[in-house]
């Protein structure tokens, strides 16, 4: 359940024991063990997590209880604008929020710094050795690529794998792109050479063979939506 009313909706039907945090007390990336409505209700685990860039929660239950939980959730949200949404909507939101997807922004050949999640690597806080530590230190000290946001001209969206050029030289690659309904802009995520990663740098997104058709674009602040993460922390 994601969106500004998600906490309000959950509070209508979540019961928590005294030993667990209430929904109103649940911090970012934390969870609570709870039940539907009362002590004898359906057992749940609710985490303050999501993949949308909005205030949101994820509800976990036994598979056999899922239909009943779904009905409770939809009934609680019927007056708050709650509607079902699929992966298409989720993908738009995560691109706007700059949230990475395996197979797009990263894979086994892309390090966390190139994928834009270098903050997850505990180089300063973990003294113990771990697999890949020495290599990650070197990669951080000598970055080659950087994840940036692009804003494209026109309404033809960039697709995963489209090349990014300055002149005839390829300097990057599109990892994800969409026409953002929230921002009303044509946006993309791009992994680009660090030497061309400054804000407002003008580039071109190549279509067809990368040369016959080009879409003008420029590097903008990343992520595109709520860069300070104020909504998810609200």
Predicted regions and their residues:
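Conserved, structured C-terminal
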Residues: 1-234
